[in-house]
Amino acid sequence: MKLELGNFYVEEIVFGEKTSFKDGVLTINKQEALDYVMEDENITHAELHIVKPGDMVRLCPVKEAIEPRIKLDGRTYFPGVTDEELTRCGEGRTHALKGCSVLVVGKHWGGFQDGLIDMGGEGAKYTYYSTLKNIVLVGDTNEDFEKNEQQKKNKALRWAGHKLAEYIGKTVKDMEPQEVETYELEPVTQRSEEVTKLPGVVFVMQPQSQMEELGYNDMVYGWDMNRMVPTYMHPNEVLDGAIISGSFMPCSSKWSTYDFQNFPALKRLYAEHGKTVNFLGVIMSNLNVALQQKQRSALFVAQMAKSLGAQGAIVAEEGYGNPDADFIACIVALENEGIKTVGLTNECTGRDGFSQPLVTLDEKANAIVSCGNVSELVELPPMPVVLGELEALARDGLSGGWAGDEILGSSVKADGSVIMENNAMFCGDQVVGWSTKTMKEF
């Protein structure tokens, strides 16, 4: 399978008369874009903003991030989501607007799964999305049934973000890209001797799938991942719209759709393929809640890795707590097959850093890369501009915020300053591979 990714680098985003891209400038007709978003009768309010790195702007509650892209052959970019037609991702030519994203923010209501981004100041270092130029869709919906729920599906706003990203991506459909990245893996059984003599490595992905009720979990080709067993996938599918992010995981642990589209760990394995490793592909697992479901997934993962001839594996989980059991079970099952395995995850060691980092551990899980502590307290000064509603951080049960604490008070102070756990930083731990955090020993 061969994917060509044509990249257009965005130097500036402005509002203007015609939605277009020229000489590094992305111009958006705001009214036309809003009219397109408002075609969904569930959207009751929508506004667009542009923010760039260094802007003293705080965004909350942030729900999703998507890179604007378009398929040149006319196929929908997110099959099963933005169109019911199912077509295969990961092949042909896709054009992408690089250095920018569409961010989806609630006008008022947040929830456990939503987060915060500071584009400038002290808080900017905590999230990758402060380094991007962002088109911010701030919206509200008629989904009254969940407005006061701590856990929200956020379907209308998330779908609006995906459609808007495709709408903006159309600006470069018929243009010549500044560069073309090519992603191609030969069939596993048809590789050269030079490649097959290298250590075979699989990448095991564990996207969020904990919720038994449909609509909260990550989706693959529009299918809720709670309803699947581990599956072999081509990495190109992941990088090209097959998976969208869900609306459940504490936000610093979240893998946004933008993360799936640009997954740095996958791209690094591609870069090493044929040089230091024989990249065998992706085993797409899950993170279901019942013990038997976890055991079944571990059995599937280990069997597939062994059948593919893997000598090494990387396991990455989207989340912590209950999913730690899946994470460790997969590592142990792989190690039991003689497959050397490295884990990628964050940890929950408490605000003092002294608690056990994962819910369950095993001596065979002896090579784990930590991407952060979800419980670490973060204090941020007031911001002059807030897009969305900052009070949502305290009022609506965001995973790193609280309405009251006998010592710390509310997460949101009267002057607009914030104290919260890292949990609420949008995609803050970046398990996908571009975390800038380091660890120190004392």
Curated annotation (Swiss-Prot):
Pfam families on file: Gly_reductase
Keyword tags: Oxidoreductase
Enzyme Commission code(s) on record: 1.21.4.4
Gene Ontology molecular function: any one: betaine reductase activity
Enzyme class (EC, first level): oxidoreductase
Catalytic activity reported: acetyl phosphate + trimethylamine + [thioredoxin]-disulfide + H2O = glycine betaine + [thioredoxin]-dithiol + phosphate + H(+)
Record carries keyword Oxidoreductase: yes
Disulfide bridge map: none
Subunit description: Heterotetramer of two alpha and two beta subunits. Component of the betaine reductase complex, together with components A and C. PB is substrate specific.
Primary role: In the first step of betaine reductase, the substrate is bound to component PB via a Schiff base intermediate. Then the PB-activated substrate is nucleophilically attacked by the selenol anion of component PA to transform it to a carboxymethylated selenoether and the respective amine. By action of component PC, acetyl phosphate is formed, leaving component PA in its oxidized state. Finally component PA becomes reduced by the thioredoxin system to start a new catalytic cycle of reductive deamination.
Annotated protein name in UniProt: Betaine reductase complex component B subunit alpha
Organism: Peptoclostridium acidaminophilum
Gene for this chain: grdI
